[in-house]
Structure formats: C-alpha cells, structure tokens
C-alpha cells in the first residue's frame, strides 16, 4: 500500500504530510461498507470539500482568462469544465482509478473505470490536498491536472456541440442519441447511450446521467468520425 501511495504522489507532484487524508480520498463507500469502516471515513466528505475548492479556483481562472465574457457564458464554461465526464477524463490522465479502494462488488462491475467513481475521487483528492497543504497547493494541482491543455479537453467536455457542428458542416445531418441501457438503483443509476450519425453508430458512452453518457458517446463519435475522414 505504501508503495502505491508513493507512486501516486509522484504522479501528481504533491507529497502528503498526512497520508491518512490521501487514503481517505481513495476510499470509496463500497469499501467502507464491506470492511465495516465508519461511513464518514470514505471519500464523500472530501469530495464535498473538493467540489467547492474546484469551483472557486476554476471560477477565478475563467474570470481572468475571459475578461470580456458575460456572467452567463462564464457559468456555462465552468459547468462544462467541472462536469462529471470532464473530471473523469482528468482522472484517467492521472490513472486515478487504479489506486482506489473499492468493495468487491464495485470492483467486479467496473468501478475503477466508472466516470461517477473516478470524478468523485478526483474531487476528494482536491479536498485532501487542500486540507493537507492549503489553498496554494490545491490551486497548483488543479492548474496542472484540470485546467491544463484546455484546447484538447474542450473536445471532450463540449463534445455534443462540436460533433453537431462537424456533422452539419459536411452532411447537414443531425446526430441522434439513443438510450440503450439504464441500470442501478435510483440513487446510483448508470446510463448507456449510443450516438448515431444518420443510420451509422459512431460512439457509445456511459454516465451517471443521460447527459453525461451522451457527452461521452459524442466524444467517441468525434474520434471515429475524424478517423474515417483521415
């Protein structure tokens, strides 16, 4: 366990003074339930805190980076940047899923790659860094792993808009999103959506909401569509 923690800290470029905070950030509720650990020890409280820290820092970034942009557009941009699919994308770049502490059920059903799980863990990690190292270190982490390479990330977090513009510009076709699977209890649903251009299937996505699943399906559709044109 210690080697894994060290490896993750090397990846993110931050060394925890209190590694218990890092462990808590990686601990999913399925793990605490299975191991009979008190519920408050899982990463949900840190996720709550990290969400607030992320919103403040991303708001500050957008405020100064877009000095003439009106409030409504800034709000839309922030919502896109910190939505579940976007944060899951950032978590995948770090490989965060492989370090999570999951219960056996969550593990066997693909929890390490589930957007809802990895995006929540990323926010929990932000909360843990904030508590351990303060605002400046949390800001540095967000700058390096969430606000970095925004041009390429825009392809992901605004995929539906980009795909529609690409398709209309060439074929005048509409993109159709089809819900093909809905599973799980009401408090933890998972949706699977397919993206079609004309009659052809171009992408599939899974998310905790239909919108998140559509965004991921659109992202994969863009990659396939661009590949077909090359």
Predicted regions and their residues:
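Double-stranded RNA-binding/processing signature
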Residues: 1-230
